[in-house]
Amino acid sequence: MAKGGREKIKLQSTAGTGHFYTTDKNKKTTPEKMLIMKFDPKARKHVEYKEIKLK
């Protein structure tokens, strides 16, 4: 069987609301940490989300 190339990650809001998304990414093609703009429903606006490890 092939080794899984995708890693589960957590995207944490930088607005300080505690909101997060979970997703997965291909660790071979994108080894750097993700920084993406997404909607934070607690802040009610688009903010940056940083990748952190999923525990």
Curated annotation (Swiss-Prot):
What is any Pfam family matched here?
A: Ribosomal_L33
Q: Which UniProt keywords apply?
A: Ribonucleoprotein, Ribosomal protein
- Point to the regions of Basic and acidic residues compositional bias: 1-10
GO BP annotation list = translation
From the UniProt record, which GO molecular function terms apply? structural constituent of ribosome
Which InterPro entries is this protein grouped with?
Answer: Ribosomal_bL33, Ribosomal_bL33_sf, Ribosomal_zn-bd
Annotated GO CC locations? cytosolic large ribosomal subunit
- Would you indicate the residue range of the signal peptide? none
Q: Which SUPFAM superfamilies match?
A: Zn-binding ribosomal proteins
Q: Where is this region: Disordered?
A: 1-27
Superkingdom of this protein's organism? Bacteria
Q: Which NCBIfam families match?
A: PRK00595.1, rpmG_bact
Q: Fetch the HAMAP family from UniProt.
A: Ribosomal_bL33 (MF_00294)
The record's comment on protein family reads: Belongs to the bacterial ribosomal protein bL33 family.
Xref: PANTHER family: 54S RIBOSOMAL PROTEIN L39, MITOCHONDRIAL, LARGE RIBOSOMAL SUBUNIT PROTEIN BL33M
Q: What is this protein called?
A: Large ribosomal subunit protein bL33
Q: What is the lineage of its organism?
A: Bacteria, Pseudomonadati, Pseudomonadota, Betaproteobacteria, Burkholderiales
- The coding gene here is rpmG
